[in-house]
């Protein structure tokens, strides 16, 4: 799959070749999801999160392209599938990595830390950092912060530069 993505020439026009690769990626993910569901049969899986395979991302210009068909994945797995995270995050002012800050928040939620804010670093293809600040009643101007970020924390996350992409082949 990696070679097919790398060698695909027509990203701009979303060629038939890319559509075929997208279908193949979706079937591959469906197989993995089915295997995970079978191996964790004691848990009821209600929903699957699927971000696909990113083949182009430019947060500054709000452009991102992922291969993977969430609707097809839902049909294949017979599960509800949440997808298109990166695109929706860009549309709403983010940088296209909406799940990482939530994961970081959950990591520190139950730790009794003396110093705030906490900054978590995620070194993926592109590195991003999440600043997690504790909210105190006097810090909250209205309910928007509480509804958006959770009861006790405010998150700020952004891409900060290259990460593993420098060593990826």
Describe the residue ranges of each PLM region:
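Glycine-rich phosphate-binding loop and adjoining helix at the ATP-binding site
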Residues: 46-105
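Short hydrophobic/aromatic-rich motifs at helix boundaries and adjacent loops
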Residues: 4-7, 42-45, 75-77, 142
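Short beta-strand-loop/turn "lid" adjacent to the catalytic site in phosphate-handling enzymes
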Residues: 8, 12-70
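A broad structural signal for alpha-helix termini and local helix breaks/kinks
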Residues: 40, 77, 108-112
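Short helix-loop-beta connector
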Residues: 42-44, 113-116
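Glycine-rich phosphate-binding loop plus the immediately following alpha-helix
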Residues: 1-4, 82-110, 119-169
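A broadly conserved amphipathic alpha-helix scaffold signal in soluble, globular proteins
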Residues: 30, 34, 71-75, 102-109, ...
């Amino acid at each position: 799959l990696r070679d097919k993505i790398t060698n695909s020439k027509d990203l701009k026009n979303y060629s038939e070749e890319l559509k075929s690769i997208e279908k193949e990626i979706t079937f591959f993910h469906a197989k993995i999801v089915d295997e995970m569901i079978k191996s964790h049969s004691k848990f009821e899986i209600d929903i699957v999160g699927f971000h696909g395979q990113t083949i182009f991302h430019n947060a500054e210009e709000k452009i991102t392209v992922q291969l993977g068909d969430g609707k097809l994945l839902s049909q294949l797995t017979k599960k509800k599938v949440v997808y298109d995270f990166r695109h929706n995050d860009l549309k709403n002012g983010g940088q296209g990595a909406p799940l990482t800050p939530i994961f970081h928040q959950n990591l520190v939620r139950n730790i009794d830390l003396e110093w705030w804010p906490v900054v978590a670093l995620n070194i993926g293809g592109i590195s991003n950092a999440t600043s997690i600040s504790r909210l105190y009643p006097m810090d909250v101007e209205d309910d928007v912060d509480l509804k958006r970020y959770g009861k006790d924390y405010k998150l700020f996350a952004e891409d900060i530069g290259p990460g593993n992409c420098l060593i990826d082949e």
